[in-house]
UniProtKB/Swiss-Prot annotation:
Name of the protein in its database record: ATP synthase gamma chain
InterPro entries named in the record: ATP_synth_F1_ATPase_gsu, ATP_synth_F1_gsu, ATP_synth_F1_gsu_CS
Gene Ontology MF annotations: ATP binding; proton-transporting ATP synthase activity, rotational mechanism
Alphabetical list of HAMAP family matching this protein: ATP_synth_gamma_bact
Species: Cyanothece sp. (strain PCC 7425 / ATCC 29141)
Cross-referenced Gene3D superfamilies: 3.40.1380.10, ATP synthase, gamma subunit, helix hairpin domain
Membrane topology category: Peripheral membrane protein
Underlying gene: atpG
């Protein structure tokens, strides 16, 4: 009977854990929806900004745009902005992006280029602090749905490093959202900005939907800045001055999008991890229930044999 009680207690414990993992899965799914809604909400501003920049860049195509954020110089030191999460229970999300950042730092070191880290998220901070890596700034406690104010705070630090020539290039290491079950860490140059990179490019918006009782992602192709400004438009200010003023906004927008994709990737990874944990709990409960029933059946059979044996002994 002691064995039966132990199995019964374990079944109850697994059921309680399953309730927690299922709740975490649903919470993550709701937050993925919020992240999706924020991407859609910021899209009009991003479209208009890209359109203006595209038009200005086309207008200045044959001019020497010697602007601080576009100026390239010999690379002696690089700032690596690494975007990770504050918490675990999200599969390999943190491990993968930290691993890619560590690989990139080794690549720079092999090329004889110095580097420093700007870290977002406790997981990256803990990892690189333990290894005594050079760290210029850290950020924790960002919202699960990143805001423009948070992106602006980080962008200001990066601009300060670049414009003061403390670093010659800024690279971003973040997790690009692909699907609910797939994401990949990527490295992207943030500064100096590439004027050719301001041209319009197709983009995607992800939408979390349900089908057959399961979550899935629908991807919608959108086009940014497909139309430039009219060529006969007259500027009160010099187009170069306007471009100089708008480039920091463009940087903020790029950074905000990266934070949003990283957050969506983390939430999707957590949702998948909790879904797998719930499925594993179901299988474990099923196995434990079978073990419990077999043990209970054996105990009942033993009791019957003892009763029959006792009755035979009395004859």
């Amino acid at each position: 009977m002691a064995n039966l009680k132990s199995i019964r207690d374990r079944i109850q414990s697994v059921k309680n854990t399953q309730k927690i993992t299922e709740a975490m899965r649903l919470v993550a799914a709701a937050k993925v929806r919020r992240a999706q809604e924020q991407v859609i909400a910021t899209r009009p501003f991003a479209d208009r900004l890209a359109q203006v920049l595209y038009g200005l860049q086309a207008r200045l195509r044959f001019e020497e745009a010697n602007l601080p954020l576009l100026r390239r110089r010999e690379v002696k030191k690089v700032a690596l902005l690494v975007v990770s999460g504050d918490r675990g229970l999200c599969g390999a999300y943190n491990t993968n992006v930290i691993k890619r950042a560590a690989e990139r730092s080794k690549e720079l070191k092999a090329e004889g280029i110095d580097y420093t880290f700007v870290l977002v998220g406790r997981k990256a901070i803990q990892y690189f602090q333990r290894r005594e890596q050079p760290i210029d700034a850290t950020y924790t406690g960002l919202e699960q749905v990143p805001t423009a104010a948070e992106a602006s705070q980080i962008a200001d630090e990066l601009l300060s490093l670049f414009l003061s020539e403390s670093v010659d290039r800024v690279e971003l290491v973040y997790t690009k959202f692909v699907s609910l079950i797939s994401s990949r860490p990527v490295v992207q140059t943030l500064l100096p900005l590439d004027p050719q990179g301001l041209e319009a490019q197709d983009d995607e918006i992800f939408r979390l939907t349900t089908r057959g009782g399961r979550f899935e992602v629908q991807r919608e192709k959108v086009s940014s800045a497909t139309q430039s400004m009219p060529q006969d438009m007259i500027f009160e200010q010099d187009p170069l001055q306007i471009l100089d003023a708008l480039l920091p906004l463009y940087l903020n927008n790029q950074l905000l999008r990266a934070l949003q994709e990283s957050a969506a990737s983390e939430l999707a990874a957590r949702m998948t991890a909790m879904n797998n944990a719930s499925d594993n709990a179901k299988e474990l409960i099923k196995g434990l229930s079978m073990t419990y029933n077999k043990a209970r059946q054996a105990a009942i059979t033993q009791e019957i044999l003892e009763v029959v044996g006792g009755a035979e002994a009395l004859k």
